[in-house]
Structures are given as structure tokens and as C-alpha cells.
Amino acid sequence: MVLVITEPIKSQSKTVCVIGAGPSGLVSARELKKEGHKVVVMEQNHDVGGQWLYQPNVDEEDTLGKTKTLKVHSSVYSSLRLASPREVMGFSDFPFIAKEGRDSRRFPGHEELLLYLKDFCQVFGLREMIRFNVRVEFVGMVNEDDDDDDDVKKWMVKSVKKSGEVMEEVFDAVVVASGHYSYPRLPTIKGMDLWKRKQLHSHIYRVPEPFCDEVVVVVGCSMSGQDISIELVEVAKEVHLSTKSLDIPPGLSKVIEKHQNLHLHPQIESLEEDGRVIFEDGSCIVADTILYCTGYEYKFPFLESKGRVEIDDNRVGPLFEHTFSPSLSPFLSFVGIPRKLIGFPFFESQAKWIAKLLSGKTSLPSSDQMMQSISDFYLAREADGIPKRNTHDIADFNYSDKYADYIGFPHLEEWRKVLCLSAILNSIENLETYRDSWDDDDLLQETLQDPYFTQLSIPSV
């Protein structure tokens, strides 16, 4: 398909509201600032970091996260460590290097990544643009009754301060960078609503001690399900891991063989009022707690787009390249929606594209062409057997390079791809130890000689 690029918008400074001060919001603010736009970042918490701003206190009254407005944004648990080596995670001009007196591990804890984001914020002077303790309640078009897709839309943003003060402001553009690891995605299980014992989603899991001597069923074999199960076996009486497929990777098999109180099961058939959990193979246990590690929903409860951006089975769309609503671009955009890629460099390429579009330095295809591209993408995913709910799961380094080509952003360095793949393969084989034991030292030493680490002028903090 040949895309015909439309005329750029007029070059002038725009007023832009960025929603969220996590990694995607911070890099968006940085790129917009570089292009001379007037930026306001609205952040509901007291500091930067987004998901990486650990919140030890959870909502005990809403253990499954069913309320429209969650009290707690972060889903990070106390022991969480990065699943990718720090070398691959930094932005293009700000390596995530170890610093004296801090967590220097290759796979550091969440606290270290938060400090990296705070350093990034300080070095590039972003804090002055951020309003903390401000929750965005509404985003909608000012001229919403005008159905002309080519008309420039302005956006009303209604926000509420922690004090209760309500503000209404108009912006030229809005960048949604509010994350997607806060609203629990729950399975549908027979008897789930009638089960009287403790049920919670991993969104509110923080430490293992409350589960001491319990029989715990962990539903879901994703990264969090595996990590939390490994942690729980040290304190729980029994841990029963329920998964869609019993064809598990070697690393998880080793963990199960090592821990006699960790058991693997198929999916749950039903939950009984007397505490029994019946699995699809007919086996049954009596549990104290069910912990759902079943992922998260994309939700933007503040956004009113008149149906132009909707969420259907966790597909946010239609979005051109997971970023732009064809009929509202470039004045409404999303940063950070794709998953299963090297996140920070990708967020940066998204932010650069948005900032340059708003400056009039580049253009998008026509609305019709973007819609056709989206349709072609959906059909290709369907042909590959990828469920709609996994629309934004990329798992393809080449996609990041293709995306970068839109704005002339450099491709992912080969060492990033190699180190990331090495970590993935090591985790498959050695789930319990891969963060502390690896066999790619030769690759690592070669990587650390790259100009990214040796020649880049890294501002001090």
C-alpha cells in the first residue's frame, strides 16, 4: 500500500496537555518541549514515575479493582525486579547506567528505575511542567458538534486537584500517556461471585506475608504469575498455579520440581461456596485465597471522543500505528499502548513523531489511508491467529524499526536486540535465577564499548 502524505499543519507553538508522568508521559513532555510547544503534564500522584512509583498501601475494599476510579495506580509489588537488563532500557540519549550507592544489578529492583526516571526529569527540566496530585476527569472536543474530520479540534480538559478544586482548560492537543497496568482484567469463572473466601487481583499484591500458611491458587502463568508464585512458596502452605496450557517452559518446570508445595493445574472449571476450587481435569483443592494474575484492561475513563476511539476486547482503536486516531490526528494521540517490545526507545519514537507533527515538520497519511492501513493490520493479525485482545502485543523488533522510519529516528541498535533476546531465552530456561546468573558476558562487554555508553555526553545529576 502506497501512503500519500497530506500537507503539514501550520508551524506554530501548540498548547499540549500530557496525561501522566510515567515513562511515556515524561519522554512526550521532553520531545514536545524540544519542539517549542507549551506543555502541561497532569499527574494524579505526588511524584513522577507512573507505574514505577511504588504504592505500598492498597485498596482493601476493592481487591478485584472493579470500581471505575481506582484509588491506587501502581501495580508494582515490593520485590519486583526488571525482566530486561538495564542496558537495553534507556532512552536514546540517556543510558540507564549504574550509579554509585544505588542498585547496580543488571536487573535492578523497581526503585532503581524510578530513580532513573527522576534523573531524566531533572536533567531535562521537566518537573516545572508537571502538576502533581491532579486527576484528569474529562477530555473532550470543544467543537464536538462539528462533524468535519478535517477541522482542527481543540480539547477541553477538566481536572480535579487533591484539594477538590476543579479546573477546566482548553488545549490544542492532548497526549494520552496514562499507562495500562492499573485496571484488572478478570476471567469469567463459574461460581466466582459466590465464592466466600478471599479473592484479589495482582494489582493489589505487594508482599507475601499476608498469605502465610495459606492454600493459595494463582490464576495466570504470565510474568507476574510466575514471580509471585515463586515468592509465595516460601510462606504459603501450598501454591496452586492454574494456567491455560500445561505445556510450560523448562524454567517453570525446574521451579515446580524444586518446590514441593508448588503445583500446576489446568484452568478452573468452577468455584464452590464451601471453598473448593475445581479444575478442568476434575482435580479439586480447598483454598483460602485466589490471586488473579490475569493482566490488565486498557481504560481511559476520562476520554470522550464521540465514538472515534473505542475499546473492544482490549483493542484500542482505530489507531494508526497504535498512536493516532485517524479522524482526530494529530491533536489526539496515545503513547505507550504497544506491549512486548523494548519500551522506552519506542515511547521516545512515538513522542518525537507527535511533537514534529504538531510543529508542522512532518505529516500523516490521509484519514482514509490510515483507516485502510489499520484494517490491513487487523486482517493480518487475524490471519496469524492472534486474538483481538492481543492486538497491541507486538513481539517484533522490526516493528520498532519500521515505526522509527516514519520520522527518521534511528533503528534499535543491534546490541539492544541481542541482549534483550538473550535475557528472554535465559528466563525461559532458568526462570528463578536468570536475573542474577547469565551467560552473555561477552555480549555485555562488547555492548559497553558502544558509543552509546562511551562517547555520549551524559548530563550529570
Swiss-Prot record:
Protein's UniProt keywords contain Oxidoreductase: yes
Sites where the protein binds FAD: G20, A21, G22, P23, S24, G25
Gene Ontology MF term list: flavin adenine dinucleotide binding; N,N-dimethylaniline monooxygenase activity; NADP binding
UniProt cross-references to InterPro entries, sorted A to Z: FAD/NAD-bd_sf (IPR036188), Flavin_mOase (IPR000960), Flavin_mOase-like (IPR020946), FMO-like (IPR050346)
Required co-factors: FAD
Binding site for NADP(+): G220, C221, S222, M223, S224, G225
Function statement: Catalyzes the conversion of methylthioalkyl glucosinolates of any chain length into methylsulfinylalkyl glucosinolates.
Protein name in UniProt: Flavin-containing monooxygenase FMO GS-OX-like 8
Source organism of the structure: Arabidopsis thaliana (Mouse-ear cress)
